[in-house]
């Protein structure tokens, strides 16, 4: 790819960032489509995020992806949020239209799309959702919008717990889905929730390098064959949770599905063109 002065810049703002496959995936897609954009990753944490957004405007970047730990903070720095993004309280995509910034969240639509593509119908189902960060709440919000009956969200009593309660209130007030929030330390409640759940989704970074030997499921007997287990983490590809799930006879969806589908939607938001899905799946080794 020969980058010329006519090319526009798209970024990814996160910390840490070096593990991300998004730059490789998006640049392969842009090159295949013959579009004059290049995608670059920037190490940006909460402290440097405000300045980075000013830089985005000054450089007339087309937009940026937003990942941990900036997804919730980013809502404060855009001019407009989609209804779904308001429900989530976090964004992973910013589109810059001549200095007017729009915030979107494709994490939820991407993950739910991956579930649907596997042949699983979420309508009327119950999900146990681990975590209350930007990705997790995006998945919960989109699942609620698309027909989940109940979401049992588990999170430790950390800085995200109050945000989880606020998220649950927003979803309960605006959808037909019932969301409850429980401290993950309550292992009895966790076990009972899994016993009646249809889906278990890990929306935390537990399982991601350097936590690849960790899982929030301490007892594999809590997993049953009727449970669909899904991951947001894709590095490593096969997390400990997915290994546990397969040993227990569960159907699984790895983090590549969410990465692919949320990235496809981002691509279209930035470029106005269709994402070369089958090509990207092939060259990135994402499988069917």
Curated annotation (Swiss-Prot):
Leading EC class: oxidoreductase
Annotated Gene3D superfamilies: Leucine Dehydrogenase, chain A, domain 1, NAD(P)-binding Rossmann-like Domain
GO-annotated biological processes: amino acid biosynthetic process; aromatic amino acid family biosynthetic process; chorismate biosynthetic process; shikimate metabolic process
Residues annotated for NAD(+) binding in this entry: 132-135, 155-158, 205, 232-235, 255
Keyword Phosphoprotein attached: no
Record field: catalytic activity: L-quinate + NAD(+) = 3-dehydroquinate + NADH + H(+); L-quinate + NADP(+) = 3-dehydroquinate + NADPH + H(+); shikimate + NADP(+) = 3-dehydroshikimate + NADPH + H(+); shikimate + NAD(+) = 3-dehydroshikimate + NADH + H(+)
Alphabetical UniProt keywords: Amino-acid biosynthesis, Aromatic amino acid biosynthesis, NAD, NADP, Oxidoreductase
Domain of life, source organism: Bacteria
UniProt keyword NADP present: yes
Associated pathway: Metabolic intermediate biosynthesis; chorismate biosynthesis; chorismate from D-erythrose 4-phosphate and phosphoenolpyruvate: step 4/7
One Pfam family named in its UniProt record: SDH_C
Record-listed substrate binding positions: 71, 107
GO MF term (any one): quinate 3-dehydrogenase (NADP+) activity
EC number(s) reported in the record: 1.1.1.282
The family this protein is said to belong to: Belongs to the shikimate dehydrogenase family.
Function: The actual biological function of YdiB remains unclear, nor is it known whether 3-dehydroshikimate or quinate represents the natural substrate. Catalyzes the reversible NAD-dependent reduction of both 3-dehydroshikimate (DHSA) and 3-dehydroquinate to yield shikimate (SA) and quinate, respectively. It can use both NAD or NADP for catalysis, however it has higher catalytic efficiency with NAD.
Assembly and oligomerization: Homodimer.
Protein name: Quinate/shikimate dehydrogenase
């Amino acid at each position: 790819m020969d980058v010329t002065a006519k090319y526009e810049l798209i970024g990814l703002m996160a910390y840490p960032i070096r593990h991300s496959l998004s730059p490789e995936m998006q640049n392969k897609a842009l090159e295949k489509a013959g579009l004059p954009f290049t995608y670059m990753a920037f190490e940006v944490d909460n402290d440097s995020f405000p300045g980075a957004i000013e830089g985005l405007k000054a450089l007339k970047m087309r937009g940026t992806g937003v990942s941990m730990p900036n997804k919730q903070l980013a809502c404060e720095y855009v001019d407009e949020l989609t209804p779904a993004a308001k429900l989530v309280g976090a964004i992973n995509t910013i589109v810059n239209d001549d200095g007017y910034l729009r915030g979107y969240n494709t994490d939820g639509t991407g993950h739910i799309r991956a579930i649907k593509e596997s042949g699983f119908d979420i309508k009327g189902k119950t999900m146990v959702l681990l975590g209350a960060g930007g990705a997790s709440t995006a998945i919960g919000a989109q699942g609620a919008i698309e027909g989940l009956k109940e979401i049992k969200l588990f999170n430790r009593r950390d800085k995200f717990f109050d945000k989880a309660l606020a998220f649950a209130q927003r979803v309960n007030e605006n959808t037909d889905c019932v969301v409850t929030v429980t401290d993950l330390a309550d292992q009895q409640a966790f076990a009972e929730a899994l016993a009646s759940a249809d889906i278990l989704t890990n929306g935390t970074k537990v399982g991601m390098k350097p936590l690849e030997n960790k899982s929030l499921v301490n007892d594999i007997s809590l997993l049953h064959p009727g449970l669909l287990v899904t991951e947001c983490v894709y590095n490593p590809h096969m997390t400990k949770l997915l290994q546990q799930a397969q040993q227990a006879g569960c159907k699984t969806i790895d983090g590549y599905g969410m990465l692919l589908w949320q990235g496809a939607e981002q691509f279209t938001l930035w470029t106005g063109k269709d994402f070369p899905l089958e090509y990207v799946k092939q060259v990135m080794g994402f499988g069917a």
